[in-house]
Amino acid sequence: MAALSLKGVRKSYGGAQYVLHGIDVDIADGEFVVLVGPSGCGKSTLLRMIAGLETVTEGEIAIGGRVVNALEPKDRDIAMVFQNYALYPHMTVAQNMGYGLKIRGVERALIDARVQAAAQILELGPLLARRPRELSGGQRQRVAMGRAIVREPSVFLFDEPLSNLDAKLRVQMRLEIQRLHARLATTSVYVTHDQIEAMTLAQRVIVMNRGYAEQIGAPVDVYEKPATTFVASFIGSPAMNLLHGRLSEDGAAFDVADGPRLPVAGAAGAGRGIAPGREWILGVRPEHMTPQPGEAFATLAVDSCELLGADNLAHGRWGAHDVAVRLPHAMRPTRGETLPVALPARHLHFFDPATGKRAG
């Protein structure tokens, strides 16, 4: 195991426009960090640079205190798990798991011992004699993880390993990866576009956007205090409601652009840097708008209601803004119904419309 450090890491191709812009992060020994963002944000490029599959244009990558910019992937003491399992079809599970050690000249007895140990961790013991075609998608991904485990690397790198699995298997594999990290405590960097994977797996999340690290922090902090409108809209399902408008001179109301006046008394508290009488983007998550006794409320004309099982989502519009409200299972408003919604001051977020950055 080892700490991983990225200092001012930038990437461009042929001296053209940069695709990664000055990434700075220190990942502690044994920490599980998730890079999350939409397609094209630079997360996989950054992972490939850590692995040595892409060169570093500027900056420094260090593993265990050793700068690895000039080292080949095989010399970085890392193991990688890919989206595509990359298993040899003619080899058994045991042979696939041990092949990387075999080509490195590791003794057969040690290979067998490590394969057996990894198989026990991943519950692959009964499958060791099978070939990939005889395995399910989840089993194949566990074999790919086992191949990484037997290396006993300093750092695990996961490149969207669950993308090829169906929804049920993704949930199962998320739990298995959690248990694996709890058992091995190996430094891990995990790439995904799925914010649910990021929130459930990570000790810290790095939210990527257009080559920048928009926010780095614990999942709960990123969710509760998004640094930008991008983070607010990307993290959370459904996304945070973002409303353009103007805060009244007394700070007691927010006038949604082409929409209603909303009561927000107490939201622009002292020291939060939220100036009244100016334009803001107001953010509030759907679950914080559930009607509560005694809360200041507005009304929303319901366009549709999604029945999700444990809870429901009511949808409507304030001006040009789509608004979603999470409701308990028993509340199922119909189209055209007027729904009272809460706007608790403690759960309101204000963002600068010019920069998209959070205030306060």
Swiss-Prot record:
InterPro entries: AAA+_ATPase, ABC_transporter-like_ATP-bd, ABC_transporter-like_CS, ABC_transpr_MalK-like, ABC_transpr_MalK/UgpC-like, Mo/tungstate-bd_C_term_dom, NA-bd_OB-fold, OB_MalK-like. Coiled coil: none annotated. One of its GO terms (biological process) is glycerophosphodiester transmembrane transport. GO terms for molecular function: ABC-type glycerol-3-phosphate transporter activity; ATP binding; ATP hydrolysis activity. GO terms for cellular component: ATP-binding cassette (ABC) transporter complex, substrate-binding subunit-containing. NCBIfam families: PRK11650.1 (NF008653). Belongs to the ABC transporter superfamily. sn-glycerol-3-phosphate importer (TC 3.A.1.1.3) family. The complex is composed of two ATP-binding proteins (UgpC), two transmembrane proteins (UgpA and UgpE) and a solute-binding protein (UgpB). This is sn-glycerol-3-phosphate import ATP-binding protein UgpC. The gene is ugpC.
